[in-house]
UniProtKB/Swiss-Prot annotation:
PANTHER family: DEVELOPMENTALLY REGULATED GTP-BINDING PROTEIN-RELATED (PTHR11702), MITOCHONDRIAL RIBOSOME-ASSOCIATED GTPASE 2 (PTHR11702:SF31)
GO MF annotation list: GTP binding; GTPase activity; magnesium ion binding
Presence of keyword Plastid: no
Organism, scientific name: Glaesserella parasuis serovar 5 (strain SH0165) (Haemophilus parasuis)
Protein name as catalogued: GTPase Obg
CDD domains, alphabetized: Obg
Keyword Cell division in annotation: no
All residue ranges annotated as the OBG-type G domain in the record: 160-333
Region (Disordered): 361-391
Secretion signal span: none
Swiss-Prot/TrEMBL keywords: Cytoplasm, GTP-binding, Hydrolase, Magnesium, Metal-binding, Nucleotide-binding
Amino acid sequence: MKFIDEALIRVEAGDGGNGCVSFRREKFIPKGGPDGGDGGDGGDVYLIADENLNTLIDYRFEKRFAAGRGENGRSAGCTGHRGSDITLRVPVGTRAIDNDTQEVIGDLTKHGMKMLVAKGGYHGLGNTRFKSSVNRAPRQKTNGTPGEKRDLQLELMLLADVGMLGLPNAGKSTFIRAVSAAKPKVADYPFTTLVPSLGVARVGADRSFVVADIPGLIEGAAEGAGLGIRFLKHLERCRVLIHLVDIMPIDESDPAQNISIIESELYQYSEKLADKPQWLVFNKIDTIGEEEARERAEAIVEEIGWEGDYYLISAATGQNVSALTRDIMDFIEANPRVEEEEKAKEEVAFKWDDYHQQAMQNPITEDDWDDLDDDGWTEEDDEGVEFIYKP
């Protein structure tokens, strides 16, 4: 299945149903009074996280999703039926962004998590609501309000504990193959990895972490070179970044310069991401021997001013890989994921009671509404008309 991590869709909540202007007409009750019912509320649009999905491909071609409209009110005090809601299933880790305002509506980070993305319109009032001691035959009603309509940008960000950084051919995919059962493609040419992949690394019987591999970065990625930086968003939720460096590049490039390139591109993309804990890991030490690799690593670390720890491994042979994974596991257990506190729900600008109060002050009169019923009938219209009343 093709990996799609972005989709632009339009969601339309249902409009509220209009109120009804109607009067009770029964045998022996010549002045039955108003009995027009309220309309129904419009349907809402929700997103729900589903752990069985791993791509947004379902929204690549189908772009518009509309909830049901609330039914209009009816006579005999009948309230209109509420519009049907719709729920769109998305992968866990999906972020919803309003495409017009760029407001982040929310993140779906757990299976079954549900989020409202478009609120349905509120119902209109029937003429029964307007009766009073001085207005016994009201011919006023209110219409329902429109439902929200939004263009949503859906972005899938993988949920991983560890993120891999590095130039193309640094050995990131080989490392994931060494520590997990994942089998990303490995070859001796740049950009073998074209889409992100996940692997579960197990350390012992009951300890494990998830590692994410993304396509390699090159100089100028922030300006769109290579595959650009569109996949860096998948590292935003990682707790630690593993910067994998080829200690003896086949193109004879300077490893210290390569490290600086990645750090620069990372900083240009996001300062927050650049400030995450990073571990420097020198790979492919089997090509030159561990002693020479250690000497080269010390020189590189001194040149770039690296103050943290660093590791020497060979992902191809598995040398020192187990020790690295154990240290990663210890770090993850010592730094549990901090759950983002749910934002306090802000007061909605639209308030139900306020709307009804304003609507009753400015109702739609018989000169405004255009319902095709006899609710605007007057006594003058009774002349020459026979009424048939139901018992």
